[in-house]
Amino acid sequence: MDKRVLALVSACALGALALTSCGSGGSGGGGTDPDGKVTLKLVAADYGDKETNSSKAYWNKVATAFTAANPDIRVDVQVVNWNDIDKQVKTMIQSGNVPDVLQTGGYADKVADDLLYPAEDVLSPGTRSDLIDSFARAGQVKGVQYGIPFVSSARALFYNKALFQQAGITQPPTSWEELRKDAEQLKTRVPGVTPYALPLGPEEAQGESMIWELGNDGGPTGKDGAYTLNSQANIDTFRWLKADLVDPGLTYANPATTDRKTAFADFAAGKAAMLDGHPSLIRMAQDGKVDYGVAPIPGKSGPLTSTLGVADWMMAFKKNGHRDQIRKFLDFAYTEDNQLAFDETYDLMPVTQSVLHEMTTSGKHKDLEPFFALLPHAVFYPLGDTTWDAVSAELKKSVGGAVSGDPAKVLGDLQKKAQDAVANR
């Protein structure tokens, strides 16, 4: 889920309301206050790349406006960076300080632990029917929707036109071999620039690795849904990355410690010539005055016919018993104005039909047209598998080691952990 930037100014008013709705948030769950009012605890991921465009400003604004319209319901906002949100939420759940509403990258493990309300319990029929059907279906586990799509994105190849021109490259690469040759040319003719930014650090290694695997007809699962992390196609993919990009110095020296945020910042600063990115990189590149192009992602033998699509998710926890209050808040958060504001702030793709119609007809989103075209052909993580969050966490920690060590061993170890997760679910 492109990513990501206009800074929203917090709309928090003075007084007690502002202190409740706009606080940075503690670790406790929501509850009923002494005055009889309910406080919902919202934990959300941060899509900003710096303090000035942190998602905290957006959620504080939504929370304040919601409480103004619903004085008996307060919203305590806690925004957490992507590197830490999974760990912090796990700690909160283990300690009993469960949030009411969580917006993050996965939901299925919470379903396995019977923590979540079904979507139909916390969304009005009007809000549910506005969700784009393919994304709503992706939120299902065994035919019941628990994950509520919040934003979506697709991936494409970004390239720096000025650096390409300096290197004498006239077209973006369409295959791995062309990408390697272009990277060599960039290294030779534009010294000091990272030819291809390969982020396999813990922020989103599962995404970068899946993109490359798709290019070799691989991926994390097979047609039957079983994990295939150490398939021959995937092993061959990482052997190519190691031998043809990492060892020759055509990317970062240690991709396993390099996060997406670093790669995006390097591209926006003109320090990286190519990378796989999502729409939020558009604004960053524009702010950095980078003359960029967008093209299909190169595969082993030609451009990918399907690309990685990402949806991030909203979910509602049962523990605090605030079903009705959560429904009111989510219906408010999913209004067209609020959804459009978030999508436009971070150059993300919509998940509701009303916002998709607005973005495709307003004429204000020409830069997103390549991504609108890619989305129908996107391939998604195995989100409905209740073990995916655990497997994804292992990929984030370890898969980057496959480009410095033995790919077969690294992927084999990951496959064993995935199989153990399946056996123990």
Question: Model regions: which residues?
Answer:
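Extracytoplasmic/periplasmic substrate-recognition and gating elements
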Residues: 68, 167, 248-249, 286-348
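Conserved C-terminal helix/tail region of periplasmic/extracytoplasmic solute-binding proteins
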Residues: 165-166, 249, 374-425
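Long, aromatic- and glycine/proline-rich binding clefts that accommodate carbohydrate-like moieties
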Residues: 292, 344-390, 425
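Hinge/lid segment of periplasmic solute-binding proteins
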Residues: 105-154, 208-210, 215, 293-295, ...
